[in-house]
Amino acid sequence: MKRYVCSTFVACVMVLCVIPASGAAAHEAVAEDAGNRIAAPACVHFTADWRYTFVTNDCSIDYSVTVAYGDGTDVPCRSANPGDILTFPGYGTRGNEVLGAVLCATDGSALPVDRERAVR
């Protein structure tokens, strides 16, 4: 009985060690995909849950923002005046994640890469 319990425990530990390693590689790929967008400044905050993502502009100027998702979902840019709270889709129930709020150009396209401010 002790041998069975010990081998079961060892097998479980091995599985738990392999799963995070594969997840970390997937997360790095997601960060690279989002790296072509400029992160919103620190005064633009976001809160994400499964259904909605709220982006709040606590800055003193307007920003055009959108949300970067782990699976590359593209949502339209929206203008946020100071004090505005914008609502975007949440991360859902299928393993997606919200990477952060990102800035948009005035024409609604992604801004060019700035590696120091890119979403990571």
UniProtKB/Swiss-Prot annotation:
The disulfides recorded in the entry are 43-59, 77-104
Is the Signal keyword given for this protein? yes
Q: Does the keyword Cytoplasm apply?
A: no
Instruction: Supply the source organism for this entry.
Output: Streptomyces griseosporeus
GO terms (molecular function) for this protein are: alpha-amylase inhibitor activity
What is the residue range of the signal peptide feature?
1-32
Which UniProt key words apply to this protein? Alpha-amylase inhibitor, Disulfide bond, Signal
Could you identify this protein by its name? Alpha-amylase inhibitor Haim-2
InterPro entries, from UniProt?
A-amylase_inhib (IPR000833), A-amylase_inhib_sf (IPR036379)
Free-text function comment from the UniProt entry? Inhibits mammalian alpha-amylases specifically but has no action on plant and microbial alpha-amylases.
